[in-house]
Amino acid sequence: MTKRNKIIYWIATIWLTLGMTSTGVGQIIEMKEGSGAVNSMVHLGYPLYLLTIIGVLKILGVIAVLIPKYPLIKEWAYSGFVFLMVGALYSHVAINDNPKELFGPALLLILTLLSWYFRPVERKINVVNL
């Protein structure tokens, strides 16, 4: 892995984990305002019990991405982040929400893809052709 790729990986991963942690904690404690918070979920038409589920999954995903071992669990975490952000983007588009509401999920989706693509070899799954 080149130094450039390592820098890209860590910058994307740090910003991704900060974003997922902050929104995840906000969802767990059911903040009224903010990205993915109570007012946002009500606006999108989702039940509030999803806040706790999504918040806990985000925190678990952050832990999986940051720990150095368990590449299969990392892959699941990255795919979960992609599913969450694609779902968030679609939800905002489906209700004809203000385009500025797409920025947060789009940024986290891009950071997820960058972190996944530039992850070090030791954090990838070894694939064996049969």
Label for each model-derived stretch:
Residues 1-130:
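Membrane-interface extramembranous regions
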